[in-house]
């Protein structure tokens, strides 16, 4: 473990407000008002808005080496935006006031909610920080049965750590056997950790409890990467919807704890034995459902899906995606959903189905379409999504009439929203996720025209230490796929960057990437067309005519520039999506001069209809609004 000197330790202790702040020497010091200090202040000021906008968790960096500042902000998932923002603002103020020249500092603030703010001159993302920042037993000794307290406390912690191993946080209540008292507990990990390291950090806090806080009525243990807190009273409003785990009058003993562990294992073994004896039809259904271990609570009854879609009536059909059809469904309570029915004949169907459920069920971000659940029945595999009324982006962008609804403000907002969504997939989600099929048809629009990324059927997740991979099966949409993926099957986060670059150019120009008829009679793709404009002709010729002159010229030119940087032939020359986000939101960042992009061509021939269909690829339109009404009549 790296040893370091704690320069400043600030602790405020009360029953309503707990915080711990540490300014660290290990990374050195900076000169006040230096470039690093400025970057640090800009970084901290960006956290309150971005943390609340991106599901309560945000990582970023500002500046260039050696003055780059890395930062992280986090609130408990589900915290209302106002409380989260206030907590981050107060944490920032504490750091700026007390860590005047330390290049690294951490603060956990626990007031009306829990928040974490951290900055450094080095990248600490995904690193496990195990130094104890604070270990306090600031309440009185427990006066009743200590054995009961110990058993109940450890049982509660085991359950919460298990839940945090896939959610990064957990709150719980457990009643003592020998008194009316209840233990209220809360655990939280920094969401940049791997799930394995989250569990490891929390388990070490349990070990620390035994040496610092055994027998106390309450306490808190804080590390850079995680913390635990427990009390004999509810705190932070975390327990309003939680019922005590142990019923009144029921004892919990060592034998009971063992039973809790052993019985499910025995039942699982018995279930596996029965599972192997079932008919093939039942076997396949159970296999898929059992594989999706993280999403059991999301399962719908297949009959309920049939009823909601009028038995998949054609009038409810919204569109056709890469691996199946999409229908509109309406449940008896009036809730509207989009139902994706995977094709039975697709050789990729089952794999893609499980992949999508595994990935999407773990993702929570305002720029991603929310997966509500799934259903399986034999060969039938169903995904249920939130219903978005405004169709997909391509229905507006490439329609000569509807594109008029997309002024520059809306288009710029769509570009920024897509950027945030991909940054979350690549960097801020629990796994590094590569979409591999980003296109206008996979960007849905909500009622306010905010973008939401959909269709994770071909998505791939990476290990933390993995940067690229190779596939023998190239999937996606021609025109959006980068050269290294088409020719060699190599993909990485830079594959999505390429697709995003094409998408930016389509959004600005209102033109499909598939083919552009140039003035000299030749045919090229959109990337080639924009590259020619960049070198020889007015760049703003690209701007979609319906926007007229009502746009910010500098914003448009900068977005075109970023689009060209994203479609560079060499993946190493493309920026990361995090860098793209900073390029869009910070105009002081100087952009590099782009080199010729990948797939630049110019050929004189007439378009081939078949090739044109291949170039466009399948498009999912999950929000198509059908004007025909159908009444489902159920038999009496």
From Swiss-Prot:
EC class name: transferase
Membrane-spanning ranges: 255-275
Reactions listed under catalytic activity: L-seryl-[protein] + ATP = O-phospho-L-seryl-[protein] + ADP + H(+); L-threonyl-[protein] + ATP = O-phospho-L-threonyl-[protein] + ADP + H(+)
One Gene Ontology molecular-function label: protein serine kinase activity
Annotated signal sequence range: 1-20
Translocase found in the keyword field: no
Catalytic site positions: 437
Chain positions carrying an annotated carbohydrate: 33, 50, 98, 101, 121, 137, 145, 197
Cytoplasmic-side positions: 276-636
GO biological process, alphabetically ordered: defense response to bacterium; plant-type hypersensitive response; signal transduction
Record's bilayer topology term: Single-pass membrane protein
PROSITE patterns associated with the record: GNK2, PROTEIN_KINASE_ATP, PROTEIN_KINASE_DOM, PROTEIN_KINASE_ST
Classification via Pfam families: PK_Tyr_Ser-Thr (PF07714), Stress-antifung (PF01657)
Gnk2-homologous domain residues: 21-124, 130-235
Gene3D superfamilies in the record: Gnk2 domain, C-X8-C-X2-C motif, Phosphorylase Kinase, domain 1, Transferase(Phosphotransferase) domain 1
Alphabetical keyword list: ATP-binding, Glycoprotein, Kinase, Membrane, Nucleotide-binding, Receptor, Repeat, Serine/threonine-protein kinase, Signal, Transferase, Transmembrane, Transmembrane helix
Organism domain of life: Eukaryota
Recorded family membership: Belongs to the protein kinase superfamily. Ser/Thr protein kinase family. CRK subfamily.
Entry protein name: Cysteine-rich receptor-like protein kinase 24
Designated gene of the protein: CRK24
